[in-house]
Every structure is written in structure tokens, then in C-alpha cells.
Amino acid sequence: MKRSMYAGRVREEHIGTTITLKGWVSRRRDLGGLIFIDLRDREGVMQLVINPEEVSSDVMATAERLRSEYVIEVEGFVEARQQANDKLATGMVELKVSALTILNTAKTTPFEIKDDVEVSDDTRLRYRYLDLRRPEMLENFKLRAKVTHSIRNYLDDLEFIDVETPMLTKSTPEGARDYLVPSRVSQGHFYALPQSPQITKQLLMNAGFDRYYQIVKCFRDEDLRGDRQPEFTQVDLETSFLSEQEIQDIVEGMIAKVMKETKEIDVTLPFPRMSYDVAMNSYGSDKPDTRFEMLLQDLTVTVKGIDFKVFSEAPAVKAIVVKGNADRYSRKDIDKLTEFAKQFGAKGLAWVKVTDGQLAGPVAKFLTAIETELSSQLKLAENDLVLFVADTLEVANNTLGALRNRIARDLDMIDQSQFNFLWVVDWPMFEWSEEEGRYMSAHHPFTLPTPESAHELEGDLAKVRAIAYDIVLNGYELGGGSLRINQKEMQERMFKALGFTADEANDQFGFLLEAMDYGFPPHGGLAIGLDRFVMLLAEEDNIREVIAFPKNNKASDPMTQAPSLVSENQLEELSLQIESHD
């Protein structure tokens, strides 16, 4: 029989019609001789009623065999329910079954197919095809499909060209670890799976495509966390002849369209802009969450003359004020915050509370001489808690930024209904890597430096600024972009600043440098993490919830057991040997 419609879409207007439905048995109940079945498909659940007085003995016998997750086909008459169920979209109607066929049986599932099921993440991933049957998971992927549909329509309307770039590319430095693919034909050589289509999309601009986009898989072999996976999807854009502002306008329009069509939210345009320095100094993060206050306060000058060397001799002293919540934090609670602070390089955490109009706490006695000035600067009031970090500016910012976010979550200070977008601009071109002992690209080595700072490529690299911009949503980096280098001489200077010899630069990027000899236009672009964007729109805490078949925290798949061993024959074809490092 041909299915008439989805079970979850049957409504009162269908009363009096005969329809055919197909789906899974979500629940079976026997009551007063009647059998009630909740039939589930991707659109929802509908109640079926099987009355032994109105169906054949064969239908009744089949109904009595039904168990959870059996796949069935039913035909019946749509009726109004005697008692409506306002928890279901189909709660005003039910189907009086006249015909029933079991299409497939099912074993008892390892967990119940319902929302808010309590089961380990690895069990969910081991049986991902069952986990994806849960209504909230289905809704996440419907949302994801709507987002990608909206993005494609928007970019198509703006005459962007959708172009597929290679999955087998060249391994290049200056990024995360590559996933490598050995070549059978060129033995001893390897492809890399792309961390992004960065260079190829720039070459498309040199080819005259003018506006490119792609919703593309990318791969990075890095440590995992809640908003990272080894393979991920990004919305990749590149344009020719547009300014930084023009590119941002296009992206803002795209996001506004997605928010309207998927969440029915009108976002205010243009998005706020914040410099990198303001973000770090006021929020302690290059991806600030602006849904709440608790800004970092610089007290370095204020405490300079006090008789407390931890403060007076520190390169930087900064603080955050937890307004009106000092009584929520015991000494034990603050000790936990101190241990948390040490994870970010801080040596400790100093604190005072405002109690009966005065400062109280371990360091209060050292602040007596500046108490009035301090109270005024921090706008202190009764029951405030002040947390101080005295260290380098970088450690103070990073530590207090992390504390700010943790405390806001702990105290439920964040309005979860808000979607606060902003641009972080005016980035440094380089960042110092303690591990590498050198400066590395803050974004990538193809970013265009500002005209005012480009001369420092041969001087103080810390002073070079980039024409780069990150888009941030609620404390998450949604994506980043920049104007790109299109002049060969500038690109060679950039490689040299990063420590490449001329031969090394030519070996790694010679094809790009050669392309710059052939009229490379000014260009720029951006990439947005689609998984992360959908995660935030779905109000989930982990991108695994919006990726159909993700990896676990060990970058493995409990369902397929990937990664797996391969045969000796396969290794021999690739001229590879596995060495043990026990």
C-alpha cells in the first residue's frame, strides 16, 4: 500500500478519511480489550486504536505480536479522539485500524527511544541509528537542513558560484595536524585531507570566478572538545574586489536570513564591532559572550603603591566583580575557583567580599589605603565578591575571562533566549607560540597585513596587525575571515617573517606564488562553522548532537570501530610498515 501521509501530520481536517501510515511502534498499551499503538515516524506520533470487534482475527493476532520498534504498515479511518492529548500535535485525532502488516520486527533496544534518555555517550554512538530516531535528534537535523537550504538560496541569489574543491590535497605547515592519506601510485608520498579549502578558493579568485561558496567537509587532527570534531563542515566563501565591510555585510545578511527562516528572530543589523584588544582586555576572550556584564577591570595603577608585593610588583592586576552574590560563595567554593584559575596559568586567586559596607577577606587588610578608590572604580555594593588575578596581562585576561564564563553559568546569569552576534576586528597578525618558540600566524599566512603595520614584517612582529575579522555568537567563534595577500612580494615577506627560507616557501607554496605572477585580484572571504552554528541554534551543548555520525572524545566511532587495523596486503600496496612503540 502507498503511504498517504506522515503519521505526525494527521490533523482534524483529515477526520472521516481513510489513510495508510507506515512507521515504528513507539509504545503499545492494552486497555479494556482494545490495543492502543503510538505510531512514530519522522514527523511525530499518532495514536492507533485496534478494536477486536471491528477487525479480523488475523489483524488482531498481528496486533498482539507488536512490540516496541517493530516496523508496521496500517490502514484505517481517522476519527476524533474522545479525550484529546494536548501534548501531541496529533492529539485531537486517532486512527481506527482496519488493516495491519508487520514490515519488520525488532530486538529490545539497548535504550528507550525517547527524549532525555539517560545513557552513556558511547552507547548512544554505538547505536547511533537508534539514537537518531529520538524526536529531539530528528528535529536537530531538520533544523540543519533548513539552515543549509537558507544559506544556499541566499548565496545563489547573490550570484555566488558553488564549486567543489579537492579532498586530496597537499600537506602544508602553519595549521593543525593533517590527516594524511598515503599514495599507492607515488610510493612514499602522501595526500592530506583539507583543513580548509583556503588556497584553492583563493586560486578560484585568480581564475576570475569572483564569488565562490561551498558547504564543505574539512578535517583537523586535533584534541577534541564539545565544539570540535575531527571532521566538520563549514560554509566557505571567497570574493574578489570587495572590501572588509562589504564582505561583512554579505555575511550579516546571510545570518539574518537564517535566523528569520529557522528561528523567526529578527536580528539587528549591522552587528556590533569590537577590537581584539577590547575583547581581550574587557572580556578576557577573543570570542566574548556579551549576553552578560561582569567585565574585567584593570587595577594595575590603582594597586601600584600598596604594601602587598603580589599586587604592587605584578605586571598586571585585574579583577571581576560578582555582583550581589558573595553569600553564594563559601571559602570552599572559592578554593575550587582558585584551582580552576590555575588551569590557565594563574598562580592563585585573591578575593574580597563587601560585608556590612566594608571589604572582608584574606587580602582586605592590604587594601585599606585604597578602599575608597577601589570601591569607586569597581562600583562596589553590599554582598559583592571581587576576584583578583596578579600576573602577566595575558594570564590575567585569560584566567578572568574563563572565570567570568564559569561563574555566569553557575549563577544562571545568561539569558539563553538571546543571540548576540558581533565582529571581533583589528587582530594581531602573529601570536607567540611557547611550544614552537616563535611567532605563528594568528589566522593563516595568507592574511593581508594593514598598510600601516606591514613594515614591521621585518621588525617587531608583535606590532603587525591583520585585516582579519571573526564573527562571534554567544561566546563561540562562528567563523573567521580576512582580506588576503594578492601580491607576490608581500606573500614572500610573510613567509620570511614566519621563518621560511625562500626554498622552503617555494617547496610548500610555489604553486601559489607562481599564480601571483598572473594578475591575482584583490580578494577576501570567510568561513563559518556550520556544525557549531546549528548547535547554537538548536540550543545544544555539543556539536555531536547536530552531526549524524560523529566521533567520540577519542576520535573513534564506537559503531563502525573506526579507525581500524588494515590488512598486511593493503599496507604492502602502500609500501607501509607499522612499527610498535610499546
Swiss-Prot record:
Protein name: Aspartate--tRNA ligase
Residues covered by region (Aspartate): 198-201
Location of this chain's protein in the cell: Cytoplasm
EC number(s) given by UniProt: 6.1.1.12
NCBIfam families: aspS_bact, PRK00476.1
Family matches, as CDD domains: AspRS_core, EcAspRS_like_N
Entry annotated with the keyword Endoplasmic reticulum: no
Residues holding ATP: R220, D221, E222, Q229, E477, G529, L530, D531, R532
Organism taxonomic ancestry: Bacteria, Bacillati, Bacillota, Bacilli, Lactobacillales
Protein's gene: aspS
Entries under PROSITE patterns matching the protein: AA_TRNA_LIGASE_II
GO molecular function: aspartate-tRNA ligase activity; ATP binding; catalytic activity, acting on a protein; nucleic acid binding; transferase activity
UniProt keyword annotations, A-Z: Aminoacyl-tRNA synthetase, ATP-binding, Cytoplasm, Ligase, Nucleotide-binding, Protein biosynthesis
Reaction(s) the record says it catalyses: tRNA(Asp) + L-aspartate + ATP = L-aspartyl-tRNA(Asp) + AMP + diphosphate
Protein's job: Catalyzes the attachment of L-aspartate to tRNA(Asp) in a two-step reaction: L-aspartate is first activated by ATP to form Asp-AMP and then transferred to the acceptor end of tRNA(Asp).
Quaternary structure and interacting proteins, as annotated: Homodimer.
Binding residue positions for L-aspartate: E174, R220, H443, R484
Domain of life the protein comes from: Bacteria
Family: Belongs to the class-II aminoacyl-tRNA synthetase family. Type 1 subfamily.
Name of the top EC class for this enzyme: ligase
One CC-aspect GO term: cytoplasm
